[in-house]
């Protein structure tokens, strides 16, 4: 899809202030990633620094989950750790806003209860007080105030809302039979063990089976797998498509069958308290986890810092070149070690000597829209509201977990542009004006909320050009679950692009792993691994 075609598609309806003639124009703005400045790295337009360098023990490039997790892991060592971040916010796609009736997510909005094997995630949750203790079987006990309250989910299907994501009473016999068949398979797959004695799917991914029969699923798409297994139910196909878009930002034909089935069978933790919900939820979404990492990282964060390149130099140092975007002044920092917490395509440009070893990933653009509401739009709200067969993924209610009563809230809408032409979609979104994107959101939600335009006072939108890696067929590579970490003795890489799946546990583990990998070059002992 080229840019002109994209804009024509997005603007296919009316402009926002003409949906309901005579109404005051809807307020709003586009916020988020600094696409134009960031492209200086791609285009080689940044000047070369000439002044004296400053010094640090460790420089971390990027303040997303991976970068902050690396700083968190290094904190006990008492080092001078500098984090260089382009944006004015922390957390990358896990960031949040607090300019409404409640804090609200600008990206990732929940954490599924981690498996016991996700030791780093559980360590952080225990430090936060979310994990309250451990049962006799070594399973974590969670603060019930953080587990998603009921009603958790609802779906708008055939003109009405229904509890949960599967409206059992409304499905025809064929749809119901195939959903039941798939559910049984999902349960069996969750418990299945490979020939090497490991679960076929596990989180963290490194604990998954290397069984060749299971790994063969990575050679086909999820759509091809559905065809092969004879699943023809329209609702089942929609259900799987929704899962692929929600977790990977891609259509089933663009997703490895291994990755898609991992989505359904990778969560193992079962306790009585999780019978109602497996989701850990905060008003600001995973922004709560970003705050927790930042508070514990003991690092100095420089915002508005565009890293343009790095090289190893004499004296056991790494030179990091960066641009202060506030005054466009080129600067450099000499560090004893560097963690590059950036996507593979960025890391490839920053450290060309490692380019050939980095995986090739594609990513989908996303739109996230935060709609500010002064009065309830629906008397039976759930935390997550999904519209069947809509373009977007629905919306979540930021106030769902809050106990104090208030009519005001913020509803966060998500849409992934998951087709094969991510480049065209990305280019179109980056130049699309706010009015067109906001109009698209309202039109998508109109079947369930025809009066939504009257019920919201403001809609801010964020365009994530490279939101998350898409685990396409073959993404596991020739050496599955053995991520590239050290690019050089003193340069480590940490990002969700390593495993190719944007799970919190994987991003966090990549940061912890990178920090532990550069410890020898720093001459420090971090003790036992946190992984």
Regions found by a protein language model. Give the residues of each.
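N-terminal Rossmann-like FAD-binding beta1-loop-alpha1 element of flavoenzymes
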Residues: 56-83
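Active-site/ligand-binding neighborhood in enzyme catalytic cores
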Residues: 194-309
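Mid-domain catalytic core of redox enzymes
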Residues: 303-411, 448
């Amino acid at each position: 899809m080229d840019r002109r075609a994209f804009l024509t598609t997005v603007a296919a309806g009316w402009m926002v202030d003409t949906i309901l003639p005579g109404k005051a124009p809807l307020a709003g703005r586009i916020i988020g990633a600094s696409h134009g400045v960031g492209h200086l790295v791609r285009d080689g337009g940044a000047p070369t620094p000439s002044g004296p360098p400053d010094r640090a023990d460790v420089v971390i490039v990027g303040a997303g989950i991976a970068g902050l997790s690396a700083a968190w892991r290094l904190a006990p060592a008492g080092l001078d750790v500098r984090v260089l971040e382009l944006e004015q916010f922390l957390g990358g796609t896990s960031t949040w806003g607090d300019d409404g009736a409640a804090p609200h997510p600008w990206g990732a909005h929940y954490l599924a209860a981690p498996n016991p094997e996700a030791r780093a995630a559980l360590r952080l949750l225990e430090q936060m007080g979310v994990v309250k203790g451990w049962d006799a079987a070594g399973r974590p006990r969670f603060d019930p105030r953080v587990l998603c309250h009921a009603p958790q989910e609802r779906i708008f299907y055939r003109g009405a809302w229904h509890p949960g994501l599967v409206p059992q009473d409304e499905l025809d016999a064929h749809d119901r039979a195939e959903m039941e068949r798939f559910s049984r398979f999902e349960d069996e797959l969750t418990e299945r063990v490979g020939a090497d004695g490991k679960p076929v799917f596990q989180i963290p991914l490194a604990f998954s089976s290397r069984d060749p029969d299971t790994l063969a699923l990575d050679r086909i798409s999820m759509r091809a797998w559905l065809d092969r297994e004879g699943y023809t139910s329209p609702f089942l196909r929609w259900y799987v498509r929704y899962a692929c878009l929600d977790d990977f930002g891609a259509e089933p034909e663009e997703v490895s069958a291994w990755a898609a089935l991992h989505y359904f069978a990778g969560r193992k933790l079962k306790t009585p308290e999780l019978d109602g919900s497996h989701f850990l939820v905060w008003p600001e979404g995973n922004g709560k986890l970003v705050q927790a990492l930042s508070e514990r990282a003991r690092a100095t964060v420089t915002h508005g810092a565009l890293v343009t390149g790095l090289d190893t130099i004499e004296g056991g140092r790494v030179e990091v070149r960066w641009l202060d975007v506030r005054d466009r002044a080129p600067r450099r920092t000499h560090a004893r070690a560097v963690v590059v917490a950036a996507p593979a395509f960025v890391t490839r440009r920053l450290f060309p000597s490692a380019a050939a070893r980095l995986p090739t990933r594609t990513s989908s653009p996303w739109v996230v829209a935060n709609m500010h509401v002064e009065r309830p739009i629906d008397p039976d709200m759930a935390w997550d509201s999904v519209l069947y067969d809509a373009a977007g993924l629905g919306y979540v209610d930021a106030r769902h977990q809050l106990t104090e009563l208030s009519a005001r809230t913020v509803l966060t809408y998500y849409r992934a542009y998951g087709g094969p032409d991510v480049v065209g979609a990305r280019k179109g979104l980056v130049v699309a004006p706010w009015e067109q994107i906001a109009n698209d959101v309202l039109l998508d939600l109109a079947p369930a909320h025809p009066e939504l335009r009257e019920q919201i006072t403001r809609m801010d939108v964020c365009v994530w050009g490279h939101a998350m890696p898409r685990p396409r067929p073959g993404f596991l590579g020739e050496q599955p679950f053995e991520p590239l970490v050290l690019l050089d003795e003193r340069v480590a890489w940490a990002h969700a692009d390593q495993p190719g799946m944007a799970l919190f546990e994987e991003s966090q583990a990549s940061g912890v792993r990178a920090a532990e990998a550069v410890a020898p070059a720093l001459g420090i002992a971090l003790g036992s691994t946190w992984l």
